[in-house]
Amino acid sequence: MSSRIKPHKVFELYQDDRGRRLYTKSITPGKIFFAEKILREKKEEYREIDPTHSKLAAAVVKGATNIGIRKGDVVLYLGASHGYTISFVSDIVGKEGLIFGIDPAPRVMRDLVFLSQERTNVVPILADANHPEQYDHRICGVDIVYQDIAQRNQAEIFIENCNLFLKAGGYGLLSVKARSIDVKKKSKQIFEEVRKKIEAKFTVIDYRILEPFEKDHCMIIVKK
């Protein structure tokens, strides 16, 4: 019988035999965290990642082939929220990797703490990404900075955190929400303005508009 799942061209991701769905190989088989669909094959468990709920998945579906994240990486995740995408990044980096999840909201941090009890490579930190001095003593240099923050100064937050924590040669992924920056300008104009700010500091290696999965969003991927 042919396999129902095969490696995706993006490292540590998988797809079904029709190439329509994205999966990660679970590091906590038997545990379901977000009512995600599960595919079991050859004693392995694969979790489906929904591009309408994850901007990382949306970027991959829209054609991003180098998201930079590898097994064993240390990740600084800004805007952790309830931990949906973090749970899949946790699969990607594996038990050898580590994720520092930053969020200022106590309610969502509670959910992230529950997630970290099962996924020990996730470290929840209640802090504001606008103020890295709140957590700079708790984290180390990282291989990846991933940011999903809906604030007007999201580009500046990303640049500051990359300057402080991202290792040379590391990758940054910035999810840009245009409407949080300006409600009057066209989204594409805002995307280009943010991209120019980022290009002044880092090498942009990919840029994807995330519609139809996420309206008024794009993903900018950089290398330091």
Question: Can you say where each PLM-predicted feature lies in the sequence?
Answer:
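Residue-level signature of catalytic and energy-coupling elements of molecular machines
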Residues: 60, 79, 145, 222
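Helix-to-beta-strand junctions that scaffold the AdoMet/dcAdoMet cofactor pocket
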Residues: 70, 93-94, 165-169
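Conserved SAM-binding loop of SAM-dependent methyltransferases across substrates and taxa
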Residues: 81-95
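N-terminal auxiliary segments of SAM/dcSAM-dependent transferases
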Residues: 1-47
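Conserved class I S-adenosyl-L-methionine
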Residues: 70-81, 98-100
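C-terminal substrate-binding/active-site "lid" region of AdoMet-derived donor-dependent transferases
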Residues: 2-5, 108-111, 159-223
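Conserved alpha-helix/loop element of class I SAM-dependent methyltransferases that forms part
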Residues: 8, 29, 33-34, 50-74
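S-adenosyl-L-methionine
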Residues: 100-154
